[in-house]
């Protein structure tokens, strides 16, 4: 898209052939030229052998510019512009290139697929089919190898590391022998054993119960977490999409003897069961005597949020951390009564409460001059977009921010049409409507500098008034 302009002088017809241009011409405005005459000037347009048609009439010091909506493409006949009067008239608009749109579309299509689907015309059908099959195979391999990354991106930020280790996953070259050994041992039943051991990191104590995992951390449905024990083993707790909560153990690269590690895990588990209920919080170290704390650094943020919930287990933990000697016995009784499902509901509830606040802040944009654009609802992602130079149709309700009085509205009427970005409406609308898609709804808070300024409008809008508009985009042309 590029700028286009033309000056038509009195008595000098200006010919224009759309076929000589590289794209479609959009004429958006006519402006009166400089001069001393105070008489009106009229610009006319004639296509081919047809009679001239008057486009607009401009009067000095009163009406010196006029918005237009004219389009000329390579299918049109030659056009001739003429001016009657003593002053010239300037036509302006923009050129919409043909080839660039096609190139952009093909480029976007290639990027979205992640595969080169183009083939040269010289390739025969057999070569094309084989190449396409290879690309599909590569694409499937790509999806399989990046399953972990996709699931991490889709899961909400809950302070828990998400990782899935599948038996079918290809091992790295350096650890190929060790991974093969791990699979053979896992087939003997070792992957059925479950153990979670928390390690150093945050200063948050962890509750335990008979029905919980060994560190007392409930595992939300659809999540998986990774922890590490003192012997160097990595434990991965994976919950599949069907909620089976299957747990599988992955050994570290340097661990060669998996059977010996499993025996150590059993021994450590038995010792933990004997010591259950006897753990006392260490205030100086900020952790339980067994050293059990969550590894994730931002777990402190989750703990601080869950403290605000009345009756939750984390609230009991906060109180016990202040008086460890008096509340250690009470804490042991409470954690036996608590079920993993209750604690999972508490943690997931905390995450759900955080999400609306974050999303709300991301839907409000505040500009330095005071303009506020708030997204109320979204239309279709592939809907037409409102960009400068395009004609948009909107429904709106205009109010005074001071008292909420409605001064203008077209609800129940035909949508209001205007060309975006050419100054035909107040600046707050040109900026606030830009970027909307069909079906989007926004609330615009417009300062006087981008509204009607110190003059006001029509007696209904006082000077220096802040305005609010509820705007819905109906159509884009």
From Swiss-Prot:
Compositional bias ranges of the Basic and acidic residues kind: 322-331
GO biological process: nucleosome assembly
Location relative to the cell: Nucleus
GO CC annotation terms, alphabetical: nucleolus; nucleus
InterPro entries the record matches: NPL, PPIase_dom_sf, PPIase_FKBP_dom, PPIase_Fpr3/Fpr4-like
Keyword vocabulary terms for this entry: Chaperone, Isomerase, Nucleus, Rotamase
Location of region: Disordered: 104-135, 153-366
Entry's EC annotation: 5.2.1.8
Catalytic activity: [protein]-peptidylproline (omega=180) = [protein]-peptidylproline (omega=0)
Tissue: Broadly expressed in leaves, flowers, stems and roots. Detected in root apical meristem region and pollen.
Boundaries of every PPIase FKBP-type domain copy: 389-477
Pfam families linked: FKBP_C, NPL
Keyword Signal: no
Biased composition annotated in UniProt, kind: Polar residues: 299-321, 351-366
Recorded GO MF terms: histone binding; peptidyl-prolyl cis-trans isomerase activity
Highest rank taxon of the organism: Eukaryota
Skewed-composition ranges (Basic residues): 264-274
Described purpose of this protein according to its UniProt entry: PPIases accelerate the folding of proteins. It catalyzes the cis-trans isomerization of proline imidic peptide bonds in oligopeptides. Histone chaperone possibly involved in H3/H4 deposition to the nucleosome. Associates with 18S rDNA chromatin and negatively regulates the level of its expression.
Subunit structure: Interacts with histone H3.
Assigned protein family: Belongs to the FKBP-type PPIase family.
Entry protein name: Peptidyl-prolyl cis-trans isomerase FKBP53
